[in-house]
C-alpha cells in the first residue's frame, strides 16, 4: 500500500470517530448532579432515574426552537413500573419528547403540557379511564349532591 492510500484511510478513520462523538455518542450520567448540570446547559447526556415505584430514562437530544423560544429537547422513556394498576403496565417502554426551557432543572414528565408522544397519550388515556370509572362508581352520589345544590 502506498503512503497516499494509508493517509486517506487514516483521515477517514479520524473523521468517522469525530462524527460519532459529535452526533451519535451520548455520555451516561451516573448521578443526579451530573444530569442536572447537563440539563441546565442542554448538553447531550442520558440518565436513568430510579424513583422507587417507577424507573425513567432521560436522554437530552439537543436545543431547538419551540414557539420561538429556545428549549432543550429531552426524550423520556418509562423503563419500569413497580406499582399501579395492570392497565398502567401498558405504558412501560413508551416514550415522549419534552421541551424543557433552557436553564431550567426539572423532571420533564412533571409538566406533560410540554411533551408529546405515545407515553403522554397513554398517561392521558389512563387518567380519562380512571375519571370515567370514578363517575360510574359514584353516579348516584354525584346526582344527589347536584340535586342538593338546586
Where are these regions (language model features)?
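N-terminal export/targeting and maturation segments
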Residues: 18-76
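Hydrophobic membrane-insertion alpha-helices, especially the h-region
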Residues: 7-21
Amino acid at each position: 500500500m502506498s503512503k497516499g492510500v494509508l493517509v486517506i484511510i487514516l483521515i477517514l478513520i479520524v473523521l468517522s470517530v469525530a462524527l460519532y462523538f459529535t452526533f451519535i455518542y451520548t455520555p451516561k450520567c451516573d448521578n443526579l448532579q451530573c444530569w442536572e448540570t447537563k440539563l441546565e446547559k442542554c448538553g447531550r447526556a442520558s440518565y436513568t432515574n430510579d424513583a422507587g415505584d417507577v424507573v425513567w430514562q432521560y436522554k437530552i437530544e439537543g436545543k431547538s426552537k419551540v414557539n420561538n423560544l429556545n428549549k432543550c429537547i429531552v426524550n423520556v422513556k418509562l423503563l419500569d413500573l413497580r406499582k399501579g394498576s395492570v392497565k398502567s403496565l401498558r405504558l412501560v417502554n413508551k416514550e415522549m419528547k419534552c421541551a424543557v426551557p433552557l436553564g431550567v432543572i426539572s423532571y420533564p414528565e412533571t409538566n406533560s403540557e410540554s411533551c408529546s408522544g405515545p407515553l403522554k397519550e397513554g398517561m392521558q388515556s389512563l387518567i380519562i379511564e380512571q375519571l370515567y370509572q370514578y363517575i360510574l362508581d359514584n353516579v348516584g352520589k354525584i346526582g344527589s349532591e347536584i340535586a342538593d345544590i338546586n
